[in-house]
């Protein structure tokens, strides 16, 4: 099935002046500007199916296959819930810290067309510094639930607050003037772009809020992994990938390392702790309907149940996929090949962009 992807030229300037964006709990002014050019790409996607006779993976005693990366980890890590932290992603927050250690990095649009990220960590105790941490948006609760993760945030929108309180969701609710031992502010940036945590503080906050750390009984993970690195069958060339979000995510495939190197805002995205550029084995694009639910603050809602289209990118190739999710409370998002089979992704770190249906993804050779 052919899919034509067209990037329509445009200029977007968005500025938001409010309190916690949606909900007016926290003062902020954020402005972004993006410019795009018209590009047309045609892809021919073929179904990727499980190879017959694939060598069975032997997992050593005391080890397990990570639910997040498909890599071999200590069994104890798979027995506890990961932690998902809301990450500030405006230029004043750059470079971010610790997110290069994330197993999965989500990015989605919030008010004013800006984006925020959610970094998911399985081995969070070892974090030296992570942040800047920012306020919650209600649909990020669903992203965290997809990974069975404990959600951490500094502040919240009114919609996130209502949902957390009405549904009794236990999160790491770091609030200004609250539990100072669970976070700290750096002195090299101005608020609200200077809130951070350490691995030790994350562990302390989990205890403070009494969050259950045990994975659901018999949980097998929502992602399906190849046993070894496998190029997507019949994929279109994807040596570079550009997504028309305001942060201008740009990926370049490094064939020697077998990973995509990530840039944004026209510069390599660097982890301030390590000095390394962010890299991912997998890129997953999920198109979903966005709706403005507060015109004054441009607050967004995302329809994350039902089904929709998407794209899986790895090893320099891209294929069309679909996604489906029956309900927010008990189901997880499932990625499928075009014939309805469960998508298998490569072992390693993943970047997941949940974007409006009219946003464009541009691939090049």
Feature locations, PLM:
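Bacterial N-terminal signal peptides that target proteins for export
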Residues: 1-9
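Processing junctions and N-termini across compartments
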Residues: 13-16
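C-terminal motif of bacterial Sec signal peptides marking the signal peptidase cleavage site
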Residues: 18-21
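Bacterial signal peptide processing site
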Residues: 23-25
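A surface/extracellular/periplasmic glyco- and lipid-processing/surface-interacting theme
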Residues: 32, 36-40, 53-104, 111-365
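Ser/Thr/Gly/Pro-rich low-complexity, disordered linker/stalk segments of secreted
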Residues: 44-54
